[in-house]
Regions:
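Cleft-lining beta-strand/loop regions that shape enzyme active-site pockets
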Residues: 20-29, 33, 37-50, 73, ...
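Conserved functional hotspot residues or short segments at active or partner-binding sites
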Residues: 341-342, 346-534
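Extended, small/polar residue-biased N-terminal targeting/export presequences
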Residues: 34, 44-105, 151-183, 506-517, ...
Length: 534
């Protein structure tokens, strides 16, 4: 066993050095590493797991390079790729384990479960004749049972309200889309909104669908929400930027020691090359989000509203290893069209990992002037010659401070403890028919449904029963009551209709979005003349 991993490790290191001629020093380095492994295997006091030892060595090696070069084991490769590929193989349900019972929250539109007749509220009690109710299964264990090879079948047994006996279904596993667009809708008769959560293979198609829908509704201004979007595929960012930029404008370029400069340009006619455009960013928007934001800002195509982005601008190249595992190795840096370097400094890895906390403590999230940047980091946009800044992340054109006035520890405990989610599931399960009878459409629900005192009392009683350690805090409850009610209504809408409807309600508390709406409605955007510069 050791011999196999000994050879694999040797091949791994030699493959890294095969790009250039291996000099004597590098040969000695490889030999030294193999020598250490040999002595460990022969002399160490206890037996060792060769695979784990090799994996740990690779992880430690990559950690010395930069924060984003990583090792992915063979077992994790498919899972790591599924989100950026935009799909996985399964039965197409969104589920929640509620009181040790597997409840279907929603079926994926067009997926195998929807096609065969699975309904929201159904309780899955058996999978392949194995009991899954009341046995303490975790989410990952359920996923393993429901996911599988394309075209294979899985038998499930469900309990359904008003059904006299359990119902049996045989579902054929299929490709299930992982949507990168959470929501798109008209905020006002002229302002459209799209929320993008990641950059995947399907992002362009999803965004195009959203833009076409909104244009048909009369959209004149587009707000494109990148808050919390940690990135994804570079070519997805390029294709989305091409929807907004005309001609063959440079979108981003990359350059590294072993990689010459590589330009990525726009090239086709996009769906929204004219018309107002505002991108929303925050400290969690990273990588591909920053590439898109930087291109839009540098070409004066639109405005950035929010807070400084994360600052991840390193190119990771996936390299498959012989045993099926993978490394993602940093090979270049990203630069915006004006030449700004997106990546924030990482000389001090401990400070790098704690960067957001440091920025918060320094007041950056509350005050725009807390960020002190030298003149050397000043750049100019390509059209209007506005001043923009490099040095890590994309600085917004309009800063929006974080609002923590309604957020309390008690509110956070309710959210993080999953109490809103579990109570909502129970409430919807008991009252689904009555809710739909009273509110035939989402618009009616949004306009007329309210969280009254009776509802809130039931919720607080539920929390008290389910979580003995969480003590009611009246002062903090009153501080957060308005936000809590809004969140409750949004979660109910999500369980009844979907993610898009969640955002249509909860976005009322989104300060960055509300500021962007104000920028449009008060004429601030029009005064910039950005629409007439492209």
């Amino acid at each position: 066993m050791f011999r196999k991993y000994f050879l694999f490790t040797t091949c791994f290191y030699l493959s890294l050095f095969s790009v250039a001629q291996i000099d004597e020093t590098k040969v000695e380095t490889v030999q030294k590493f193999d020598e250490v492994l040999t002595y460990i295997n022969r002399l160490y006091v206890d037996s060792v797991d060769d695979k784990k030892l090799t994996d740990a060595a690779i992880v430690a090696l990559l950690e010395k390079l930069d924060p984003h070069s990583t090792y992915i084991s063979k077992e994790e490769v498919d899972e790591a790729n599924s989100s950026i590929m935009g799909s996985f193989v399964g039965i197409g349900v969104r589920f929640q384990i509620l009181k040790d019972t597997l409840m279907v929250v929603a079926t994926i539109p067009g997926g195998p479960s929807e096609k065969i007749g699975i309904l929201p509220g159904d309780k899955i009690v058996r999978i392949e004749n194995e009991n899954v109710a009341g046995v303490g299964l975790k989410n990952n264990q359920v996923r393993e049972k429901l996911m599988g090879e394309l075209g294979t079948k899985v038998k499930i047994e469900i309990l359904r309200k008003k059904a006299k006996k359990p119902l049996n279904f045989v579902i054929t596993r299929d490709h299930i889309p992982i949507n990168s667009v959470d929501s798109y809708y008209m905020i006002t008769p002229e302002i459209g909104y799209i929320k993008l959560n990641s950059f995947s293979r399907t992002s362009q198609d999803e965004v195009q669908k959203g833009i076409n829908f909104l244009k048909d509704k009369g959209m004149k201004h587009l707000i494109f929400d990148l808050q919390g979007n940690g990135g994804g595929l570079l070519d997805a960012a390029q294709r989305l930027a091409d929807e907004f930029l005309s001609g063959e404008k440079l979108i981003v370029y990359s350059e590294g020691r072993a990689q010459p400069r590589n330009n990525l340009n726009a090239g086709k006619k996009g769906l929204w090359e004219s018309g107002s455009l505002i991108l929303l960013t925050d400290e969690y928007a990273a990588s591909a989000s920053e590439i898109l934001s930087g291109a839009i800002q540098d070409w004066d195509r639109g405005m950035i509203v929010g807070r400084r982005t994360y600052g991840k601008g390193l190119v990771q190249r996936p390299i498959d290893l012989t045993d099926g595992s993978q490394i993602r190795l940093t090979t270049a840096r990203y630069y915006t069209p004006s030449g700004r370097f997106i990546q924030k400094p990482y000389d001090n890895l401990e400070a790098y990992e704690d960067d957001l906390n440091i920025r918060f403590k320094n007041g950056e999230f509350s005050h725009a002037d807390s960020i002190k940047l030298p003149d050397s980091l000043k750049y100019q946009t390509n059209i209007t010659k506005r001043t923009v800044y490099g040095g890590g992340g994309i600085m917004p054109d309009i800063f929006v401070p974080i609002d923590t006035s309604a957020s309390t520890d008690y509110f956070s405990d309710l959210i993080q403890g999953g109490h809103l989610t579990s109570f909502s599931l129970e409430y919807v399960d008991k009252n689904r028919d009555a809710i739909f009878a009273k509110y035939a459409t989402f618009d009616e629900f949004k306009k007329n449904f309210t969280i009254d005192k009776k509802f809130m009392d039931e919720f607080l009683a539920y929390v008290e029963k389910e979580d003995k350690e969480l003590k009611f805090n009246e002062e903090q409850f009153k501080t957060s009551e308005g936000l809590l009610k809004l969140r409750m209504k949004a979660v109910l809408a999500q369980d009844l209709w979907g993610y898009s409807e969640f955002y249509q309600i909860y976005n009322d508390s989104n300060e960055i979005l509300q500021r962007a709406i104000e920028v449009i409605q008060k004429g601030e955007y029009e005064k910039t003349n950005l629409d007439r510069k492209n």
